[in-house]
Amino acid sequence: MTTRTNVRRSAAVLLVAGAAAGATVLTAGTAGAMPTDFHCTSGQVTSRLVYGGAGAGGRDAAIQFTARSGETCTLPGALPIDLVGAHDVMLSSDAAPDAPSVEISDGSSAYIPLHWTAIGSPQQQTPLAITVTAPQETSPRGDTSDPRITLPWNLGAVNAAPESHTIRTGATTAGTAPTV
């Protein structure tokens, strides 16, 4: 009977040890995994204004977002954008409400195109800054950040005449912003 009891005990110990090891592997794999479809926070990206060129009185630029090292997140196809200063200049989005999201990770980029006119010096205004509201405040790791991304406007004056006083914004696009 002693042999039978020892075999049962050994089998029970091995069963419990195997279950514990399997549970450890499963929870370790789950804890290390991050969601891949998580909206970006301002802390997960660097942002900058990129000059895109000029022609026939029009100006082009972009707001470029680059994922920080080790970060993966998704930017919606349309993001809320506002101007600081230049009270007669409006923003108008050409992005469809259902524009596709763009995933960025580990140094990859996405941008929002901007277009405006800069003719008529007596009726021009220069914004102080442009702000974008990130879609998320808390990262998958639990880090929180202010959702507002404020970029100083360094792209010169914008037409503020009533007939042409709008900066048009486009949908979030994968890749680096085009430059001249």
Identify the meaning behind each predicted range.
Residues T3-N6, G22-T41:
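C-terminal region of N-terminal signal peptides and the immediate post-cleavage residues
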